[in-house]
Amino acid sequence: MNTVNKSGYMSAKTGKRFQSKLESLKSESNWTGMIRMLKRYAMRYPNEYYIYQQLAATLYIDSVSQFKLAYKYAERAMKIEPDDDLNIYTYACALYHVGQLDKSLEYFTKIINKDIHEIAYGEHGEGVRYARQLINDSVYMAGVVCQDMHRYNEAKDYFMRYLGSKKPFQYSDFTKKQAMNHLLELTNK
């Protein structure tokens, strides 16, 4: 798998195999194996922005914490496909982790202000459930960014909005308890 594919893109068959391997490694929390696999695929399929997006998202996981490298891959994914909302979210997270808080908040806000149906059914959409999760996670992260920027009232508003829109059985990268802990910290500020 060392040679670059002429088109730089995966075939549908390769894409399915890739997705299956990716999901398997994720379910095992095998981040080292996942990073190794993604880097191999990135060399072979340099035009597949999703590979770079997944690399970035994996590299800023707490147990991996390779933030500068995550930023590099998120930036590359954005250059290839700047309109994919998951790319925008991953890029905003990477910006946050390298300390570019203003820019990070700008990108989270871009997702928050976007119409849910545009996210759900646009070119890169995966349905309303996915769109809700992406928007809610962006609201949560906007709260975190504002808290770090000492914009406490805005942070409170974001966390309250997150809690108000979180539905039972709705997937999120964050829990209600995490949002409540942030609000508890903010009550004294």
Task: Give the role of each language-model region.
Residues R40-Y41, R76-A77, I111, Y162:
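Canonical positions in the second alpha-helix
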Residues W31, S65-F67, L101, Y152:
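TPR-repeat structural position
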Residues I51, N87, A120-Y121, S138, ...:
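TPR alpha-solenoid repeat register
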Residues E28, D62-V64, V98, M149:
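Structural motif corresponding to the intra-repeat A-B loop/turn of tetratricopeptide repeats
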